[in-house]
């Protein structure tokens, strides 16, 4: 598994096995591609109660369209990259903060990983770690995408997963933990009890060896039999 160089990135974009649109040639670095900040952001509102990670999060955020935005110290926002990205089953990606932005105290993250088969406008989070306010601008280069070979290619890439919560996202998506498979199972129970106890029991019930999980055909396809 190797990181794609600028030459291989250009090659993959040329043959359309990777799509980055709009594509700016000057944004290709020696082993990454710079991505730019979109116009819409979501700002968390202060609420009385603690945020439950399994609640729907839409009402917590105020959506705003920006040309520029001032992040005060410790401010946190959800944003998205302007580019639409599509990766094949043979390539995954890592999103990293730009060094220049880190030096002014901005922490930019996209949960750092992009699955093979992903398609959409990536959501990113931005936090100001600077003791001073920092101004950001739509269209500025906000993060870098590092592309990596997946060998052999993913058997079930992100586009084929039934629970791919962020496939085809249009940017600025809030957390969708309430769609996690295990939480959906918990919600279907008549006698729910403690969610932590349910998760612990589920882990015990589903713990199996890889030999028990794979069918003979799957083992043959993976070269294990």
Task: Report the location of each language-model feature.
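DUTPase catalytic domain/fold
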Residues: 1-225
